[in-house]
Amino acid sequence: MSSFKPSRFSTARLTGDAVTPKSIYLRRREFMIGLGAIAATGAASSAFADPLEAKTTAYKVDEKLTPQNAVTTYNNFYEFGTDKSDPSANSGSFKPLPWKLTVDGLVKQPKEFDVEELIAKMPLEERIYRMRCVEAWSMVIPWIGFPLSSLLSQVEPLGSAKYIAFTGVVRPDEMPGQTGLFQALNWPYVEGLRLDEAMHPLTILSVGLYGETLPNANGAPIRLVVPWKYGFKGIKAITRISFVEKQPPTSWNRQAANEYGFYANVNPAVDHPRWSQATERRIGEGGFFGSDRRPTLPFNGYGEEVASLYAGMDLKANY
């Protein structure tokens, strides 16, 4: 287990100007004031995110944040379609609340959590993390959430539990990517972690970003964030978390085991068959090709905190 110890954090309200460029924050505030008049008439859309309060923490990187519009409109969420713009374009009908999250398996006290109650009760934190996609692009995102370990400890896991299995949602009526004759993946989306990975301080369940609740397009109402792994490990719209004894199946590994490993640790020395992992393109900075690419860091820059989890492992074989 890593010896990573974050410095003490202070309690503060995470306002938009704390993480958003000032001009954008001011425009948003003016817009929200105007929206208040619309809301009074009942015409406001439920798609507008609610503000969240969170603690500022030492979990941050000295890098420019990816613009909020890019984070919310350029991502992979195949339940809504395979194009990068599909999640934002096709998720308007998705209903993230009410939402139940079951935590079960090899535990003494299986529980079903109401996500709205979790958001109200858990000590939410802002975590500014790098996010690296296996497609060789990256972002820097100010997530809001809480350590996964703080939820898992509530169900009293048994000693026989070695892995954590995650299950996503199946709602073809609300998720057009789950309909049709030819499906990109088998549903539900499933993922997994070793127990020590799940309990690591860097691993969080996110319920928001940029000071607001998660947009549907980014995995509302609750998703996994593991910053040293490729983005496909970050399962969205989670419905179940189970303690299991054996390594659980994962969606992309099941789809193409030669391309997507179970561990999926960011590793510039191990290429994907279709994408070199040596460099990456930071979304929101420069053009698509050329000199704006930057070197990819082992474990996405979190090696000091997590490399000890894989001591003695062949990271090329266990990709």
Curated annotation (Swiss-Prot):
Binding site for Mo-molybdopterin: 75, 78-79, 133, 218, 223, 234-236
SUPFAM superfamilies: Oxidoreductase molybdopterin-binding domain
Cofactor: Mo-molybdopterin
Catalytic activity: L-methionyl-[protein] + a quinone + H2O = L-methionyl-(S)-S-oxide-[protein] + a quinol; L-methionyl-[protein] + a quinone + H2O = L-methionyl-(R)-S-oxide-[protein] + a quinol
Subcellular location as annotated: Periplasm
Transcription regulation as UniProt keyword: no
Pfam (any one): Oxidored_molyb
Any GO molecular function: metal ion binding
Entries under PROSITE patterns matching the protein: TAT
Protein name: Protein-methionine-sulfoxide reductase catalytic subunit MsrP
Subunit field text: Heterodimer of a catalytic subunit (MsrP) and a heme-binding subunit (MsrQ).
UniProt-listed InterPro entries: MsrP, OxRdtase_Mopterin-bd_dom, OxRdtase_Mopterin-bd_sf, TAT_signal
Record's keyword terms, sorted: Metal-binding, Molybdenum, Oxidoreductase, Periplasm, Signal
Signal sequence, renumbered to the chain: 1-54
Function: Part of the MsrPQ system that repairs oxidized periplasmic proteins containing methionine sulfoxide residues (Met-O), using respiratory chain electrons. Thus protects these proteins from oxidative-stress damage caused by reactive species of oxygen and chlorine generated by the host defense mechanisms. MsrPQ is essential for the maintenance of envelope integrity under bleach stress, rescuing a wide series of structurally unrelated periplasmic proteins from methionine oxidation.
Gene3D superfamilies according to UniProt: Oxidoreductase, molybdopterin-binding domain
Entry GO terms, CC: periplasmic space
Single Gene Ontology BP annotation: protein repair
Cofactor note: Binds 1 Mo-molybdopterin (Mo-MPT) cofactor per subunit.
Enzyme class: oxidoreductase
Posttranslational modification: Predicted to be exported by the Tat system. The position of the signal peptide cleavage has not been experimentally proven.
Family statement: Belongs to the MsrP family.
Top-rank taxon, per record: Bacteria
EC number: 1.8.5.-
